[in-house]
Amino acid sequence: MLALTVAASASAHDVSSPAGHAAEDAVTLSAGGEQRLNQQTLDASKAPALVAAAATAGTPADIGQWGPVVDWPVVAINSALLPNGRVLAYDSVGDKATETFPGQTFTRATVWDPSGGGQTDVRLNLGYNIFCSGFAHLMDGSLFIAGGNKDQQLNGIVNTTYFNPDTNQWSGGPNMAAGRWYPTVTALDNGEQLITSGGPSTPEVRQNDGTLRSLSTASLGQPLYPWFDVAPNGRAFYSGPDPTLRGLDPSGTGSWQTYQQRDAINRDYGGHAFFDVGKELVAGGGPSTTSAAVIDVNGSSPTVDSTAPMAFGRRQHNLTVLADGTVLATGGNSSGAGAVDLNAGVYNAELWNPATGTWRTLAAMQITRQYHST
């Protein structure tokens, strides 16, 4: 893992075809049960042509600076910042390990303390595996996790799970109506959590009393890990990865409103981030496009404006909103081929400035970060 410091001037893991995504993830579960893609990492020195093309001159004050590479006990497929400043990360059984556990009975997890770099093993031992789950923070700072991986055929599980950051303890929640694999969980303004996709077309809501409510009149087939954020009107706003923009009213049994097309791109494995109230940046995805767009959902219907393209085409990258409102793009690959292309990793970070609508190329990382990065 590396840390990038940027001078001041915040799983994307999405596909439109569940069958296609299952085929890609099956690669990671074959030939020994649990061989993960982290065993196929490539450092920058092994891709000289791409690194040379991405070379960026400047001081750390201009282009940022990556810290040293350090080993972690897990591949952080999912990670969450906790109220105490520590970071929870978890992955599949067998990740970064020689042994295999095809029974899917636990999940490797760690809590990292950035102040000292220490790691605490907090593996989940509840008899199931939350690899390929979705999560959101509850108002008390704990995490609510939905779904996971049931078997070698990549079926989802019905389990929901809680993580208590004060005690580092896991506990089971209510079972969903159907198993979910790669769902999205979205924290709503009223403290509830919206669970979408992961296989089933009918969303569910975790209510504040801890029970689940089906949005039975809002069934709609969606991509795995759909992009949802909460709009100022309280609706869950859907922005991708496919181009049709929608709003989901999670009250009662639910209802959809369909808006216009965002653009003409299916941004599978793209990135999205709400960088301001009611304003969202989407960038990359699909055939590793460089294009980006800004969606404003503050009005009665969304508006879409183009913004400057990134310097590098990316998919499987991450967008992170920083404290000053800029958006950091890291990782991904530029080939648009399959789940991973180790010869097409994008090593340079880029920083998008909402005031100017432009990107600035930053320092290059040492190791490619693509599929299952966070």
PLM region descriptions:
Residues 12-374:
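Kelch-like beta-propeller repeat domains
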Residues 1-12:
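Secretory targeting and sorting signals
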